[in-house]
Amino acid sequence: MWPLQILAAAAAAAAVAAASRPAAVLSPVTRTGSTLLVDGKPWKAVGPNVYWLGLDENVVPPEGEPYDPVTKSSYPAKGRITDVLATVRALGGTMIRSHTLGISLGNPLSVMPVPGVVNDAAFASIDWAVYQAGQYGIRLMIPLIDNFIGLLPWGKYTFLRWAGFNLTQGADATNPEIQQFYTNATIVAAFNDYIAKILTHQNPYTNQTYAEDPTIFAYETGNELLGPVWGDMDCPADWVADIARVVKRLAPQKLFVDGTYGVNKTHLAIDEVDVFSNHYYPVDTAKLQADLDLVEGAGKAWVGPDANGTKNMTAFFDIMEKSTVAVGDAFWSLFGRNLPDCGSFVDHSDGFTLQYGNPANSEYTNHRIQLIRKHFLAMGQGTQIAPDDDLPVVPCPAPAL
């Protein structure tokens, strides 16, 4: 593992070199009722989940580069980041939802490896991703915590462990004590402090804090938050309101997304929440329509930030495109080439990996990608194309803008 001082110095030097390239300036995204606006015109947030932009556990880097063998984590190569941004542009996407741009804790390579300690070197890949996203005109939606721990790790169990609760996802997912994450004053204060450290970090490429940079259009409480019973949506309204106020105080121009796993009716009246969401495994058109009806009644917006499936895909897209409440959606999840090797693609173990342009893709997979692109262009740009429209070629390496 490299000394943190060397990593931080290398990141600073790269940022100085990039400073000669003017940063793109995107307009903020605002909300009026159930409509998102950019410069007064309706805007839709369509794109993929690309969780690994800040930290990844799928690639072993070259010898000598930062790597944690316990969690198999490393920082993604800059070329991988620009490659996936160019891919999102080719897909017609307008945004990316990326977990590790906001969830980075409890791991030796993370922003907060231990309580209260900030690892500045971990911001290097995050800074680059945010900067390049702005240059590519791709906005970002960023969750702040995860209901699960994962391999990296990154979940609420990290804060529980730091506060002295010996709880693990494997053994304690149904233990009522996990609700301490939402109710324990010490944990809530620690999480609020963590949020502040993320949002007030200044990106050397843009000279803006994450709170200021309009490339990040929304922060989300977290990913698939719930309580000890699967599907209970037991993410207390008081906690959601508290986190929303923290984000709005630090970043008043950001939209705030309720990341509860499902649309919780008790949250609909929270003034600071702009957007509600749900995840759909498998794709469920009846559930989708019920969620849209709930959110419409509250005069808020809805985004489907996580969905994957094959059945009813076209019907699912059709409902969202016709809805006056749906402001976007994202599929799980996009991986690209393993730069600097343009001839190989990065794999992930969950069975939902989508690789644009992989020669090994089946005809079925490529047609699914075509349907996603058709949907993104229709919903995000109002452009209609044929379901079998040729997929644009993404050059490799994609340029750093």
Predicted features, each with a name:
Residues M1-S20:
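Fungal secretory targeting signals
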Residues I372-L401:
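Catalytic domains of carbohydrate-active enzymes that cleave complex glycans
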Residues L26-V275, H279-Q289, D293, G297-A301, ...:
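Active-site mouth of glycoside hydrolases
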Residues A19-S27:
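Cleaved targeting-peptide boundary
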Residues A8, N361, F376-M379:
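Short linear/disordered segments characteristic of secreted peptide precursors
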